[in-house]
Amino acid sequence: MIESRVMEYLNEKAMVAEAMARCYAKGLTTTTGGNISLRVGGVMLITPSGKDKSSLKSEDIAEVDIATGKNLTPEKKLSIETEMHRLIYVKREDAVSVVHSHPVYCCLFSASEEEIDTSLIAESWYLLDKVKKVPYALMGTRELAERVSDYAKEGYNALLLENHGALSVGKSTINAFDRLECMEQAAHLTVLSRLIRTKGIDEKERNRIAEMR
């Protein structure tokens, strides 16, 4: 049974493992921090808990039934944020992948009253629109899962989890990763923009960019 599970969804699991390794390589998470998931039909593939995120392999990726939350690979320890990922898929039919990590500048804004300015460059406005902050809830809890998934249900693809980290929703692992990386870049640019005079993209151009999505 376990051997057959290893072979199932092999390509999709490889994509999840690769995205997690890229997240670590880009400095967007710590060795065991963060989690990435991918919806494949009624199953969610998700990175496990307690593993080195820089060297995950296909066989490390866990499987969860989206409808019930059952761990289909009980030999693997699930991420504490599994329920958060699962509820996003339950509430967002268009969600295919979710990336959650703890990038430095996003974490800075998650602990601040300031907002990330996504209007400084066209790419961040195109990929993110606005970044929404989710009120604090203890990590790994049902309360956090409900809060985050409710905001995702409203259509937000870029979220800051107060005093915690960042989360993105995408149409693929690369799309979700791109959004999270772009959110961190936008956060960094927002900090740097305090040092020199900048101007964001005006409303007319923002609307034109939005029409391209």
Regions found by a protein language model. Name each.
Residues I2-R213:
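Glycine-rich flexible loops
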